[in-house]
Swiss-Prot record:
Family as reported in the entry's similarity comment: Belongs to the class-I aminoacyl-tRNA synthetase family. Glutamate--tRNA ligase type 1 subfamily.
Pfam families assigned: Anticodon_2, tRNA-synt_1c
Protein name (database record): Glutamate--tRNA ligase
Cytoplasm among keywords: yes
Species annotation: Staphylococcus aureus (strain MRSA252)
Length: 484
């Protein structure tokens, strides 16, 4: 193994980029970049039945969107390819043959039904299910008999007995497994395709992967992979297993959990910013020194320290994600946020599909009103409902404000001045409200609150003159006149 840091993210194209997998990719990326190493993407595509047609493309597209630029993969061969497992059979086969020749592996002809019956019997006896080794020492005659029956063999690794497999995990510390608790396991399925634990160990060795950083659901795979390294006399990589991501009930994040959006694609569609999602995911199971929580990608690369990866489960806090994205939204120029929000405004029929310059100008003003409040671009639709829907029935507090003694006088003056106002723009509207204040003597909350309630139906909201401009003269006058 070389001294250079080389890590890999190895997705299967059986689904879209999940938050958990994105975190695995991100921590591998930060680790590699912090040490000036290589971030490799390898595609584990041997499960042909489950592979999605656009699964691979989607993985790459979303990784690129997040800012996780890879150094090697199917599109950037650096001499360690092929980068798809399905194209590496020529690498696996000689090694399979070697294990068979050295009696470190053997052919097993047991049927699925026989294996299932064994498993059920073990569970009924209260035992941990494991292969009992029935075909570990077949004679040549027995093998020929099974093949004459048309049985297709799998190939099993012969697990050494009474051996302890230990590794120093960069997150969890020392972890040990007793080989007697692990049955002889399948390295090649009946269809000739190598299994995950066999192929991944071979690939990591030949690609000179120095560190394997992944979720702690892979801990139980590690001894099997170490067995393969030892069988060939290779040095294993360093391992690091990150803690689980949990939901509000502190249960493992499940793809069936409808309370949390779990795919990067969904956040893109809602109008989240990639740098905000990067920032949020980087804090799922890792923490910097100090209290600061907003960092650029470059800052994360500089400060990343694998020793600060947490052993405790990482809580997926939806409110925290909204807050982080809002911090980035506030820093963006209005045009960037408007372009992110425009598809949402069009989809909600709030702006025509082919907008005029006037429509676009109005949309930019709407975004300027709400940019500081927006948690994501798509939120502009629910935030700005008052611009498109009929006035809601007033609540008790709003009703109290609008029933104030001075309200009819205030509304009469304001209606008259706004009706004559040209251009109907925020700066002029602000002046007009000041004139009404002077003429009526009504000021402070008694002035602003009734106007806000009358035109928006709400007690709070963005800058009042800007809100009135965006609502437009006709709508504002219609809403004011009922309180004159």
């Amino acid at each position: 193994m070389s001294d250079r840091i080389r890590v890999r993210y190895a997705p299967s194209p059986t689904g879209y980029l999940h938050i958990g997998n994105a975190r695995t990719a991100l921590f591998n990326y930060l680790y590699a970049k912090h040490y000036n190493g290589d971030f490799v993407i390898r595609i584990e595509d041997t499960d042909k039945k489950r592979n999605l047609e656009d699964g691979e493309t989607s993985q790459f597209d979303n990784l690129k969107w997040l800012g996780l630029d890879w150094d090697e993969s199917v599109d950037k061969d650096n001499g360690y390819g092929p980068y798809r497992q399905s194209e590496r059979q020529h690498i696996y086969q000689p090694l399979i043959d070697q294990l068979l020749a050295e009696d470190k592996a053997y052919k097993c002809y047991m049927t699925e039904e026989e294996l299932e019956a064994e498993r059920e019997a073990q569970i009924a006896r209260g035992e941990m299910p494991r292969y009992g080794g029935q075909h570990a020492h077949l004679t040549e005659e027995q093998r020929q008999q099974f093949e004459a029956e048309g049985r297709q063999p799998s190939i099993r690794f012969r697990v050494p007995q009474n051996q302890t497999y230990s590794f120093d995990d960069m997150v969890k510390g020392n972890i040990s497994f007793d080989s007697n608790g692990i049955g002889d396991w399948v390295i090649v399925k009946k269809d000739g395709i190598p299994t995950y634990n066999f192929a991944v160990a071979i690939d990591d060795h030949y690609m000179e992967i120095s560190d394997v950083i992944r979720g702690d659901d892979h801990i139980s795979n590690t001894p099997k992979q170490i067995m393969i390294y030892e069988a060939f006399g290779w040095e294993p990589p360093r391992f690091g297993h990150m803690s689980l991501i949990v939901n509000e009930e502190r249960k493992k994040l499940s793809k069936r959990d409808g309370q949390i959006l779990q795919f990067i694609e969904q956040y893109r569609d809602l109008g989240y910013l990639p740098e905000a999602l990067f920032n949020f995911i980087a804090l799922l199971g890792w923490s910097p020194e100090g209290e600061e929580e907003i960092f650029s990608k470059e800052e994360f690369i500089k400060i990343f320290d694998e020793k600060r990866l947490s052993k405790s489960p990482a809580f997926f806090d939806k409110q925290k994600l909204a807050w982080v994205n809002n911090q980035y939204m506030k820093q963006k120029d209005t045009e960037t946020v408007f372009q992110l929000a425009l598809p949402h405004l069009i989809k909600a029929n709030l702006i025509p599909e082919v907008p005029s310059e006037e429509d676009l100008s109005w949309g930019r003003k709407l975004i300027a009103l709400y940019q500081k409040e927006m948690s994501y671009a798509g939120e502009i639709v629910p935030l700005s409902e008052m611009f498109f829907k009929e006035m809601p029935a007033l609540g008790e507090e709003e009703q109290q404000v609008i029933n104030g003694e001075q309200v009819p006088e205030l509304m009469t003056h304001l209606f008259s001045k706004l009706e004559a106002l040209e251009p109907f723009e925020a700066a002029e509207i602000k002046k007009t409200i000041k004139e009404v204040q002077k003429e009526t003597g009504i000021k402070g909350k008694q002035l602003f609150m009734p106007i806000r309630v009358a035109v928006t139906g709400q007690m709070h909201g963005p800058e009042l003159p800007n809100t009135i401009e965006v609502l437009g003269k006709e709508k504002v006058l219609n809403r004011l006149k009922q309180y004159k």
